[in-house]
């Protein structure tokens, strides 16, 4: 209808919720809870204050012009079971928008399986192979596989296929995101968090898109960034045409990482430690309209 609606997820006390508010439009622009839609969703949370909090991404996975939703986190109950879980309450799923109503996309992985349910990590979307379809990046903790990172390629037919052969670490308490590091028009991947499979060691990894459906870990970039319980914001901070990023978490200072243009970053701790947080989120926005 041309009006932006609102979705909130998280915990209130001990109860997890997913609430949807519809924008009434002009002249009042009131947000009214849509209980029919709310009942279609599980209540979602990150489960712990140390965990990542990116539980929801809005995107159009099937290019039909309607905004779908990718969700992950702790849900439990019947919802966790129908998305292929094993009783630990972890969910990763797509809610398909059918002209204003939502339903679960069943068996999205090759038409036979569900996404691996995780919590404590993050989700992101981008068209990593430039075929016109949005792909999915999922990371977090699973009771059987421990910390994992998975990339799913969108096949354009309501199914996704896992992209294998990438030397992901997998993590909890962090964030994994798409970022075009080298301005070649292909989305690379940055992975920052704590490796549950390796004594909860904090780490940061950069994976360069080879433009052929594969990625190569860029070892030289590893020593410059790491963190736990972190949140990422990606953008061109200094207007040099290169994507930088900001990182904050309980295991690291609030830090800007400036893109050097050679698949490496330089750390700049330019803001007070008051910006340091855990289990939160960060974003860039031009508040004063000065071009930065």
Locations of the language-model features?
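Blade-edge motifs of beta-propeller repeat domains
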Residues: 22-51, 91, 95-118, 152-171, ...
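Beta-propeller domains
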Residues: 171-177, 192, 196, 225-234, ...
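A detector of repeated loop/turn-to-beta-strand junctions in beta-rich toroidal repeat architectures
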Residues: 15-17, 87-91, 146-148, 200-203, ...
């Amino acid at each position: 209808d041309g009006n932006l609606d609102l979705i909130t997820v998280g915990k209130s006390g001990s109860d997890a919720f997913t609430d949807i508010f519809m924008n009434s439009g002009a002249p009042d622009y009131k947000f009214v809870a849509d209980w029919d839609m709310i009942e279609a969703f599980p209540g979602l949370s990150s489960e712990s204050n140390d965990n990542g909090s990116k539980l929801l991404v809005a995107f159009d996975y099937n290019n039909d012009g309607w905004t779908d939703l990718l969700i992950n986190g702790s849900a439990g109950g019947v919802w966790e079971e129908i998305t292929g879980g094993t009783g630990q309450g972890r969910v990763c799923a797509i809610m398909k928008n059918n002209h204003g109503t939502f339903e679960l996309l069943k068996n999205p992985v090759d038409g036979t399986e569900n996404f691996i349910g995780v919590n404590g990590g993050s989700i992101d979307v981008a068209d990593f192979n430039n075929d016109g379809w949005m792909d999915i990046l999922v990371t977090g903790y699973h009771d059987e596989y421990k910390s994992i990172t998975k990339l799913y390629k969108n096949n354009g037919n309501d199914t996704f296929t896992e992209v294998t052969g990438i030397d992901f670490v997998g993590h909890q308490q962090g964030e994994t995101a798409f970022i075009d590091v080298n301005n070649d028009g292909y989305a690379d991947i940055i992975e920052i968090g704590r490796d549950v499979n390796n004594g909860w060691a904090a780490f940061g990894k950069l994976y360069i898109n080879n433009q052929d459906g594969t990625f190569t870990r860029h070892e030289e970039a590893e020593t410059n960034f790491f963190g736990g319980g972190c949140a990422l914001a990606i953008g061109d901070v200094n207007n040099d045409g290169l994507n930088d990023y900001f990182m904050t978490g309980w295991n690291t200072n609030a830090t800007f990482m400036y893109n050097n243009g050679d698949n490496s970053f330089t750390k700049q701790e330019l803001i007070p430690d008051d910006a340091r947080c855990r289990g939160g989120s960060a974003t860039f926005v031009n508040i004063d309209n000065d071009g930065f």
